[in-house]
Amino acid sequence: MTNQAAEVAKRRTFAIISHPDAGKTTITEKLLLMGKAIAVAGTVKSRKSDRHATSDWMEMEKQRGISITTSVMQFPYREHMINLLDTPGHEDFSEDTYRTLTAVDSALMVLDGGKGVEPRTIALMDVCRLRDTPIVSFINKLDRDIRDPIELLDEIEAVLKIKAAPITWPIGCYRDFKGVYHLAGDYIIVYTPGHGHERTEAKIIEKLDSDEARAHLGDEYDRFLEQLELVQGACHEFDQDEFINGQLTPVFFGTALGNFGVDHVLDAVVDWAPRPLARVAHERTVEPVEEKFTGFVFKIQANMDPKHRDRIAFMRICSGKYEKGMKMRHVRTGKDLRIGDALTFFSSEREQLEEAYAGDIIGLHNHGTIQIGDTFTEGEALGFTGIPHFAPELFRRVRLKDPLKSKQLRQGLQQLAEEGATQVFFPERSNDIILGAVGVLQFDVVASRLKEEYKVECAYEPITVWSARWISCDDKKKLEDFQVKAMENLAIDGGGHLTYLAPTRVNLSLMEERWPDVKFRATREHH
């Protein structure tokens, strides 16, 4: 095995998906603790509660603007190199969150044991399904009251349409939480509260049919055996092929706050999740062990601090090796660039990078020339597929405070749309400009950046648009008929694509029924 192949085999690149407040931030801290990247799990010990005291580096990042370090974290674990990509929480949820999932090879789904499957999780799982991403599941908050675990598994299967295979099974919950039983291994991992800050070796009780296990479970023993019989009769067994194809998820139970069960999940990522996978380009399929460097940009992050105009373009390496100072071809522009200052995001620091391999995420300084979906190579003309625009879920009409600045407004919005900060639609029937976003914060970011960078002040007005769909049709005549009939709701997006702005869900259903030859797409590839 070449050194490059060995490096690729070590990589695991995954993202965490969850609904806000399911414990994603806590599990991220504990995963970093597993990799010893944060000495005290990102949390400064305060006497009573760890909840509000985050570490200095997070505070510093907040003052500097949107945190970059928390977007990508790289840390070693069990002789592997883990690349963990964060998907932002509630306030800063945006299309970036969806696109981040196009840059990973697997995902960790975190569910709140008291609430089960929630709306944001469903939306993120839909994106994972576009590429059949393998999913590991962690049911969190066992140190609180949770719903019946069997009910939770049923809900995963019914709502997320994926088979659920429990790997561990909880013994009690809340004050009675005693640990988990490993179904295939026939051993109990004992929960000892109060080790949220440190890595401790959990006590193991071999065999459920043992005096030690009976003593540990006490009065619960017989009831647990009954429940286990039910679980083993009704649940799926883990199957590696089904997992890799995104059809089955292994399920673990634990409490991230109590630092229990997180290592089981990370072990699953190392043992079962795929190493960096081949990526499909329009021209051919690119294998990660190829010698020549290739990569694509899936996210551009602007620094909110006006003093730092730098934007970081996040690139997933698909093949070859990045070396400091190497020459790369920016395929869309045809320009060759020498990249001497790419960033890595090791643990909690932004550092200049010496080398990186397939599966790694690197940051390029971007002065407005790089767009989402751009490919970089050592000269080959390649364009990777599967980096989509997603149909926005929220819409606003833009109103200019100074009508003389409409040119600057259009220019600014065009730039921000290319960067992925928002989507812009120009209705066929009016001079309105409509913005689309996935999270409310995107609108605030756009307004503040228009003001700072383009000296344009704007306000937003509500508008009756439920969703957007990109339109295509193989029959030119039918497409023309459709355009005449649907003119009222048609727009052109920032990339020049025909889009249908549906005022209601019912309207969209009716249109899809009436025009069976017209494709109404909820995603559109970046070109």
Swiss-Prot record:
Disulfide partners: none
Ranges for domain tr-type G: 9-277
Keywords of the record: Cytoplasm, GTP-binding, Nucleotide-binding, Protein biosynthesis
Pfam family, one: EF-G_D2
Annotated GO MF terms: GTP binding; GTPase activity; guanosine tetraphosphate binding; translation release factor activity, codon nonspecific; translation release factor activity, codon specific
Subcellular location: Cytoplasm
Keyword Transport: no
Annotated function: Increases the formation of ribosomal termination complexes and stimulates activities of RF-1 and RF-2. It binds guanine nucleotides and has strong preference for UGA stop codons. It may interact directly with the ribosome. The stimulation of RF-1 and RF-2 is significantly reduced by GTP and GDP, but not by GMP.
Protein name (record): Peptide chain release factor 3
The species this protein was found in: Pseudomonas putida (strain W619)
